[in-house]
Amino acid sequence: MVEKEEVSGGGGGISEEEAAQYDRQIRLWGLEAQKRLRASRVLIVGMKGLGAEIAKNLILAGVKGLTMLDHEQVSPEDLGAQFLIRTGSVGQNRAEASLERAQNLNPMVDVKVDTEDIEKKPESFFTEFDAVCLTCCSKDVIIKVDQICHRNSIKFFTGDVFGYHGYTFANLGEHEFVEEKTKVTKVSQGVEDGPDAKRAKLDSSETTMVKKKVLFCPVKEALAVDWSGEKAQAALKRTAPDYFLLQVLLKFRTDKGRDPTSDSYSEDAELLLQIRNDVFDSLGVSPDLLPDDFVRYCFSEMAPVCAVVGGILAQEIVKALSQRDPPHNNFFFFDGMKGSGIVECLGPQ
């Protein structure tokens, strides 16, 4: 158990009640990391299935405050993956319909709702938060909010789920963090140890905290990689196809003002193929990187994929706010068909 004087004293400590509530995670990532979380306010934009997963994880982690922003109404399709919304809430605002269950997860967190369109928010609105996470947003909005966050030293995240596929992206600017490392000890040669005793050994019982720094690029640059260069062509073979799938789906969202839906499967599938060809042509890459059957696996939000991607995204937000452990720099892609995920660092060469 955390010592009483550590948690209830001055200097930004946490209460005994909070220490009991968060005892397990304090053991996991330490008291200082938990203090940073308890001082952080987070904005989540888009309360569909992925937004619900992120909100749930951050509320349970114990941030100071969380604001759920969404100007859209609950649709019957939302009920398939959005567990914070009650069945009879169709037609209500998505954020408002999520509030009761979200707050009940952890009364110690100040959970708020905002029903205004994100595009109408002034820059000053975002400065109220330590981290901003966008879902269900257009490419233009993602780029605009990322730029606002960068100017104001706010940690920026975005992510989405499209059928079996999902992604996350982070721009933390110049981010400092600490990482726990096992100490390397030099063991002197002894009679019982033999000649190998001179080699350096890892002593798992002793660890040290190492400070590190990493630099992130804006999402605009990450989505505008020039694939024409020699180095880029070599990297192209190692790049996850999901990066290019994301480009196609963001273009679809921009053109149609929505994501592909099963209600108009044939029409949307045909349009996705056309957008794939147009996007790949503009990027200067072959459409063969994304075979035609991709259209079968990117419709609607799937609850299991939301759970995985939402868990990863919330974990990255916690790591960034607590300044503990290396963050994903900068994309994470999840392929539900393969049951695997990959971290990709994409941006200026």
UniProtKB/Swiss-Prot annotation:
Protein name as annotated: SUMO-activating enzyme subunit 1
Signal peptide: none
Species this protein is from: Rattus norvegicus
GO cellular component annotations of the record: cytoplasm; nucleoplasm; SUMO activating enzyme complex
Domain of life of the organism encoding this protein: Eukaryota
SUPFAM superfamilies recorded: Activating enzymes of the ubiquitin-like proteins (SSF69572)
GO biological process, one term: protein sumoylation
Pathway per the UniProt entry: Protein modification; protein sumoylation
